[in-house]
Amino acid sequence: MAKPERVGLIGVGLMGHGIGKNILAKGYGLSVLAHRNRGPVEDLVGKGAKELKSPRDVAAASDLVITVVGNSNQLEDIVFRADGVLAGAHKGLIMADCTTAMPDSTLKIAAAIKEKGARFVDIPMSRTPKEAEAGKLCLMTGGDPATLAEIRPVLDCFADLIVHCGDVSAGHRVKLVNNMLSLGYGMVTAEALLAAKRGGIDLKALRDVVSGGGANSVMFQRLAAYAIENDNTQLRFAIANAAKDVRYFTHMCESLAVATPVAQAIHQAYAMAANMGYAEQYVPTMVDVLGQWNEKKK
């Protein structure tokens, strides 16, 4: 089977822009879906991408369609609506989804794509927009190994760690576990940093201590940078997305008969913050949000 030459990209946001930029840099033809957020789209068009009006048009013009959207509801809309990916799917098309999505939704989409004579793989990603721009994302892949090998040259444009996790939906299942871990660390770290600050502890000294021991983590360093230097650039991940990802994890666990008391508490904290107006703020600001909750208790 020939390697894909025509790539379509649906979702040119914080992560999608870097993905598209690196695909173009390697000489692939790229079509992108029109979006009201003009900046990233126009930048890619200026680099040689073609802007198309509907997911159907993107699918029809592509050998490989990569989707990078916010949640399963958005993904299902892009696939199943009248002018969606399914309407433009053709024999030989491969759809690769980077979304952090619910595995049961993934399986439904994969089955529909297969009925069109096309193929589906899930390739959710980790790391940040900085790594997307640098072409150094981590991909957790689920699907047929031969299909993934076929699109590997494209994936190598924007990822430097690609791990095959199993059949279709395995990538999304691994991603939910990964995000539960990282976002759980984030909430614990925010609470610990607030307690340290309120207790008069020198946060720089605390960072030095934690950095030299087993409690250190990338998430700790990112939140500590915000608490100490007000640096909110190291983790550009919205609180609303954090709440969604942990909710997806608990939904997956329900189907596995796994109790999730810790995940439920973490989800409640992120969801409360989102509902109080902090939905679009980045996760490190949970240090401030927890502080404001404690002020209200006085």
Where are these regions (language model features)?
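Hydrophobic residues within alpha-helices
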Residues: 19-23, 109, 154, 195
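Helical "substrate-binding/catalytic lid" subdomain
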Residues: 169-294
